[in-house]
Amino acid sequence: MRKILVTNALPYANGDLHLGHMLGYIQSDIWVRFQKLQGNQCIFICGSDTHGTPIMLKAKSLGITPEELVTKYSNRHLQDFTDFEINFDNYHSTHNSLNKEIVEDIYNKLNNKNLISKKAIAQAYDPEAKMFLPDRFVKGTCPKCKAEDQYGDSCEVCGATYDPTELINPRSVISGQSPIQKNSEHFFFDLPALEKNIKDWIESNTLLQPEVANKLAEWFEQGLQSWDISRDAPYFGFAIPGTNEQKFFYVWLDAPMGYIASFKDYCNKNNINFGDFWGDSSSESELYHFIGKDIIYFHALFWPAILSSTGYKTPTSVFANGFLTVNGKKMSKSRGTFIQARTYLDNLEPSYLRYYFASRLTSRIDDIDLNLEEFVTKSNSDIVGKVVNIASRCAGFIYKKFDATLSGEIFDPELESEFSKNHDAITQAFEKREFAHAVRLIMALADKANQFIDYHKPWQLAKEEGQEQKVHQVCSQGINMFKVLIAYLKPIIPSIVAEAERFLNIQFISWADAPKFLINHKIDKFKPLATRIEKEKVDKILEDTKKMFENEQAPQSKKEEPKLDIAAECTFDDFMKVDLRIAKITEASHVEGADKLLKLILDLGGVTKQVFAGIKSAYKPEDLIGKHTIMVANLAPRKMKFGMSEGMVLAAGDGKGIYILEPHEGAQPGMRVK
């Protein structure tokens, strides 16, 4: 039994998942399900990537805390994964004490090995927003390939990485202004010092995809650079120890460590020894990271370097997948092809998309096109027309005429052998992540099964006298071929297979048993396992997507301007007659017999005045002593039954509360307000 730990890239918790995301998660889930059917101890972990400026700013725009935002999207992501039958063994988060402990421990180990340095660097700064701009909040032209509209850390066209200050014609995505440069002290990880570690890892990695190896060779040729692992406050994340929360760990430092935290959390819950899978000496275990091709740089350079220098096992391999296009073009909100996972799930079953993706996925880093017309045709033809149809054509005869019991003899041993002989080839295809090849092999067997049924025509045999035994044997062989096909498809379409298992009265728990025929076995009554996709369902997905983004982009209705009950207009000269002064409250006390008044003694810089103020409902006397406020110093004294009031303190109110005015720090008693 192999010990395998599989991670998938952590989804960023500031928005909903779309079908492009699901491509990678479906790929890894199929592989994990296959490994578990093989009898291997395969643990599948993931979690939410929850730090960074995008989350901080989005939360601010929504009027909620970053913690509330990431909780909201983490829950939505997990529900999408569950409904798409992505079966993680543990789903965690990067924003918790366990991950913080791991991040700080790894940072301290790197620092103790002199792999962390500090230096002042020029940073992009938005003078309008008054903040340093993280990489992803600067856009411009790539300095390498000159592609436009690229982020400040890496180019999505050529894959190059660079500093935001290297961008051509940079602009702030917050204000649209051209950022200026300001110096700030940052923390750097000495990646060049670990070049040998990375190259040793690459040379020992026999499973590394050629495209990844070629890209790594290109980066080595360009020369490795020290990696900036810090970001300036304000920032949502973990503060770097000893910086008084002015510097924070860059999200790409703590995000991969979320893999470790998620697995440690799983180990704690299930009494598993962490070191057996991810210790430095755990040579017998296997560690695989499934990622998108846009984050190879972080997983195949930085991550092995960090792990190798801090006592952790390096990945057995990193498997990258390509991007998703729809109808041959980049996903588009206006065309309705930027389809969110939930929009799909509201209209169609997940099995169809899982199968379609599997029929296109290989071990290469190829972009996958979701051709919607072909998606409908293939789902209806393969799942419904080929596989499920075999059972529907044979089950009724077995259930009604032969007491729901399969024959004790195999009618066509040669055909049975062909189904069995393909087991090794299908197994190898799944193991190597050549899912498209596995699907082709399975569908070729489905074609043979349907040809067998078409040739023998059990529906005609059933009408002929003396052909009962042949009908029994032909239909039993048909059900058995269906059983083998459905077992091979279990990693791909688990919910349909679960229904088939109930019909067959078995449970596929061993991959080795997949090609075995059932003899004298009792089945249940057949019920439809899948229905054909109607084109209208797909059209509705596109329409729902268009409407969703139209609503997002529609201008907000103009709010009615609030109306203020402004007093009658006065001249400037009239206003200047009012002498407003800074006053310090030296004494404050209750007024006996007064429900609303407090007695205040005010110091105006050597001159003392007594004022009765109607602020008792809002303030305790002891809380006011020592505060500075603003008073009308030249208001005619007013004799009250409690004493003489020699002015008025200024306060604001809306009928719900009272707020005395306080001047800015530095204002002194007696200063005139102008």
Curated annotation (Swiss-Prot):
Gene Ontology MF terms: ATP binding; metal ion binding; methionine-tRNA ligase activity; tRNA binding
Motif 'KMSKS' region mapped to chain: 330-334
Keywords carried by this UniProt record: Aminoacyl-tRNA synthetase, ATP-binding, Cytoplasm, Ligase, Metal-binding, Nucleotide-binding, Protein biosynthesis, RNA-binding, tRNA-binding, Zinc
Domain (tRNA-binding): residue spans on this chain: 574-674
Taxonomic source organism: Francisella tularensis subsp. holarctica (strain OSU18)
Descriptive protein name: Methionine--tRNA ligase
Any Gene Ontology biological process: methionyl-tRNA aminoacylation
The enzyme's E.C. designation: 6.1.1.10
Matches recorded under PROSITE patterns: AA_TRNA_LIGASE_I, TRBD
